[in-house]
Amino acid sequence: MKYYLISYDLKTPGQNYSGLYDAIKSLGEWRHPMESTWVVLTDDNTTAVMIRENLKKYLDTGDLVFVVNVSSAE
């Protein structure tokens, strides 16, 4: 299992980002500790690139998303 940190800047006021939030929640067990930050636990086959590419479908022009593996190397 791998933990990923997902952070974003959503630039479009009033835009409905429920698809983005649902896509993040569908990745696995999740926590939403800050307004634009999530931590998700995924299976070992998931990569940061896969997550980012999936989430980009729900972003508007100018929106940014950052995905990084934060699992320990143990």
Give residue spans per PLM region.
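Extended, hydrophobic alpha-helical segments
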Residues: 1-32, 37-46
